[in-house]
Design a protein with these regions (language model features):
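Bacterial N-terminal signal peptides that target proteins for export
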Residues: 2-14
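Bacterial N-terminal signal peptides
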Residues: 11-24
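Charged, low-complexity C-terminal accessory regions
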Residues: 26-33, 40, 151, 155-192
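Short, charged N-terminal beta->alpha structural module
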Residues: 32-59
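A short, well-structured beta->alpha microelement
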Residues: 57-77
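A short, gly/pro- and small-residue-rich
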Residues: 93-116, 165-172
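Ser/Thr/Gly-rich flexible loops in soluble cytosolic domains mediating phosphotransfer, phosphorylation
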Residues: 102-136, 179-192
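Structural recognition of alpha->loop->beta junctions
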Residues: 131-163
Length: 192
């Protein structure tokens, strides 16, 4: 068999390997919708996950404001609101608030975002550890009101977000790792 024939036999295999590699890098679920910037990022439950989201936006040069304890008036002028869901009793204590105060803060933020027709994105990257009773209060408040949801696979083992998306017609993207947010953000904001 000539070298050329060997090469031709390898081409389908190379194509298959490339396809598999690319498929692993693309999150599963709904097609990634477009969102406008600037973005405002805040937490829904005072977990530190919102700060990680802000850092990934910054590293990809996507204009984003951030305040873990922002009140509703602070989000004005934003085109998209990223609410990072996950309850943390430590975070609530550090912010000097209780669950009810955080729920009230998030409720006012959601009302303001809807009034200003912002694109609301719910993000859950805390995994299984951010799916307890405390987190459930914030997830149940935020997720049904989102235009789009991004969830890390280990935080969706019970398919809560997937089922909610199907029931409420909310697109849901499931990612493997937090860093997979980068490809989602690049698609959302057409960043190369």
């Amino acid at each position: 068999m000539s070298t050329r024939q060997k090469l031709y036999r390898c081409i389908p295999l190379i194509g298959l390997l490339l396809t598999a590699t690319i498929a692993e890098a693309i999150p599963s679920g709904a097609a990634v919708p477009k969102a406008g910037s600037p973005v405002f990022v805040t937490t829904a439950g005072q977990s530190a996950d919102a700060h990680a989201v802000k850092l990934l936006l910054d590293r990809n040069k996507i204009a984003a404001g951030y305040d873990a304890i922002a009140e509703a008036d602070k989000i004005s002028g934003s085109k998209s609101l990223f609410l990072v869901m996950g309850g943390s009793s430590k975070g609530l204590g550090a912010a000097g608030m209780n669950e009810d105060e955080e729920i009230a803060r998030i409720t006012h933020i959601l009302e303001k975002a809807k009034k200003e027709k912002m694109y609301i994105v719910g993000i859950h990257i805390g995994g299984e550890s951010r799916r307890g009773a405390l987190s459930a209060k914030f997830i149940n408040l935020v997720a049904p009101q989102c235009n789009y949801i991004i969830v890390k696979q280990d935080g969706n083992k019970d398919n809560y977000f997937t089922k909610l998306g199907e029931k409420s017609k909310i697109p849901v993207t499931v990612i493997e790792e937090t860093l997979d947010l980068v490809s989602v953000f690049k698609a959302m904001f057409a960043v190369k």
